[in-house]
Amino acid sequence: MKQKIVLATGNKGKVKEMADVLSDFGFEVIAQTDLGIESPEETGLTFVENALLKARYASEKSGLPAIADDSGLVVSALNGAPGLYSARYAGEEGNDAKNREKLLAELAHIAQEQRQAKFVSCIVFLQHPTDPSPIIAEGECCGVIGFEEKGENGFGYDSLFFSPEQGCTFAELETAEKKKISHRAKALSVLKSKL
């Protein structure tokens, strides 16, 4: 019998990307939104702090073990922005399209060789809300921010994030391929090795 866990995210893209993999780990994944759990305010200063906040909150509200991911895009030329604010880069009412638009505007006068970026994912697993020894797994993918959007797949900044390893943006990859090589896939692989 699979262990029930709550996936502490309201982001449908993350649920889609993570649920299948976690199911393969032997978990029965329940999205927090399916339990009527809202996301807590993200007050951490790092990805790991925010992932812990989300996991503790979801575990407390659900009574189940929890897995949370906090991730974002870190652009060197912008001193790490959008970083922790990747989902809200264009403001609280922003969306993926507005976030990408703002990023392109911020980088408009930045040369190609200075557009390095990385996607970072920090995943936390807690047995219960007061678990003193959470499992923490991190993964990252390095790339470059393009000058225009390319590709139809993915979500967030995928259409701007060019992966030299893949020779295309994340949005040009098939979903199944991205699931194998993304920052989140790398963090999930680390998590699996620690479970």
Swiss-Prot record:
Q: Which cofactor does it need?
A: Mg(2+)
Task: Tell me the cofactor note.
Answer: Binds 1 Mg(2+) ion per subunit.
GO annotation (BP), single: nucleotide metabolic process
Q: Which residues form the active site?
A: D70 (proton acceptor)
A molecular-function term among this protein's GO annotations? nucleoside triphosphate diphosphatase activity
Task: Tell me which SUPFAM superfamilies the record gives.
Answer: ITPase-like (SSF52972)
**Catalytic reactions on record:** XTP + H2O = XMP + diphosphate + H(+); dITP + H2O = dIMP + diphosphate + H(+); ITP + H2O = IMP + diphosphate + H(+)
Regarding protein family, the annotation reads: Belongs to the HAM1 NTPase family.
The protein's name in its UniProt record: dITP/XTP pyrophosphatase
Organism encoding this protein: Haemophilus influenzae (strain ATCC 51907 / DSM 11121 / KW20 / Rd)
User: What EC numbers are recorded for this enzyme?
Assistant: 3.6.1.66
The record's annotation in HAMAP family points to: Non_canon_purine_NTPase (MF_01405)
- Which superkingdom heads the taxonomic lineage of this protein's source? Bacteria
What does the UniProt record say this protein does? Pyrophosphatase that catalyzes the hydrolysis of nucleoside triphosphates to their monophosphate derivatives, with a high preference for the non-canonical purine nucleotides XTP (xanthosine triphosphate), dITP (deoxyinosine triphosphate) and ITP. Seems to function as a house-cleaning enzyme that removes non-canonical purine nucleotides from the nucleotide pool, thus preventing their incorporation into DNA/RNA and avoiding chromosomal lesions.
Q: How does it assemble?
A: Homodimer.
Q: What cellular component terms from Gene Ontology apply here?
A: cytoplasm; cytosol
> What residues does substrate bind to?
T9, G10, N11, K12, G13, K14, S71, F155, G156, Y157, D158, K178, H183, R184
The alphabetized UniProt keywords are:
Hydrolase, Magnesium, Metal-binding, Nucleotide metabolism, Nucleotide-binding
Amino acids binding Mg(2+): E41, D70
The top EC class, named as a word, is: hydrolase
